[in-house]
Amino acid sequence: MAASPAPAVDPSSVAADQLKSIIERIERLEEEKAGIAGDIKDVYAEAKANGFDVKVLRKIISLRKRDHDERQEEEAILELYLQALGMA
C-alpha cells in the first residue's frame, strides 16, 4: 500500500506562528531587561545612600567596559585639549 501524502501546510500559517514566537520572546526579554534595569537602579540608590558619588560610579563602569588602549588614547587627547585651553 502506498504512503498517503502529508497534509498540506499553509506557509502563511507557519510564518505567522514563527512571527508570533519571535514577538513573544522579544516581549519576555524586554520584561527581563526592565527588571534588571530596576535592580541596577536599586544598587545605585544603595551606593548613594552609603555616600558614593553615583555619577563617578557610572563613569567607572563605562571605563571598565572599554579597551585599555582606547581608554589611554582618549585620556591623552583629553589631556592635550585641557592643556591647549589652559585647564591642566
Swiss-Prot record:
This is UPF0335 protein MexAM1_META1p2947. One of its GO terms (molecular function) is DNA binding. Belongs to the UPF0335 family.
